[in-house]
A protein has these predicted regions:
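Positively charged
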Residues: 1-176
Length: 176
């Protein structure tokens, strides 16, 4: 496994719609493993392949620990070609952040429950119903695969404020 560089705003690759994965091979499995390692290293709970510059419909998540023999262990999820097939008509608001927009958070309104179809790392078809943090994470990461960022769900004013801050931060970085 290897750490990958996470692409940051305003890199235009983040706006790219990712391509479907046709077959699973060792390269795809290595990418998924690298994505998990990169996500954990960045203290994130989700990562899309487009965030590391890879044009593939791949996401990884770990929204919490699961109990196993009285020990808490990581609970990673790897999804290939994820597709949301159901969005609840009820909504929740939750603070979101993004590894590609570090240091910025905002309250985002999203459906409170989703059903997602995907393939696992063995290319077996799966379905998962998710709510709470996992449901939000799935929506957030699939948005990345469609070139959508969490700031796109904000009001125009809030989005512009964050974009101005990012621009200022980038100017300050370039001066250093």
């Amino acid at each position: 496994m290897a750490l990958r560089k996470i692409i940051k705003m305003p890199n235009s690759f983040l706006r790219k719609k990712a391509s479907a994965v046709d077959t699973i091979d060792n390269d795809i499995k290595h990418i998924l493993d690298d994505m998990l390692e990169t996500m954990y290293n960045a203290n994130g709970i989700g990562l899309a392949a487009t965030q590391i510059g890879i044009d593939k419909r791949l996401i990884v998540m770990d929204c919490g620990l699961k109990a196993d023999d009285d020990l808490l262990k990581p609970n990673p999820i790897k999804m290939i070609n994820p597709e949301i097939t159901f969005l609840s008509k009820n909504f929740n608001e939750r603070e979101e952040g993004c590894l590609s927009i570090p240091g910025h958070h905002a309250i985002v309104k999203r459906p409170d429950k989703v059903i997602v179809n995907y393939r696992d790392e063995n290319f077996k078809q799966k379905e998962l119903e998710a709510d709470d943090l996992l449901g939000v994470c799935i929506q957030h990461e699939i948005d990345h695969l469609n070139g959508i960022l969490f700031i796109d769900h904000l009001s125009r004013i809030k989005k512009e404020m964050i974009l101005k801050k990012i621009k200022k931060e980038n100017l300050n970085e370039n001066r250093s």
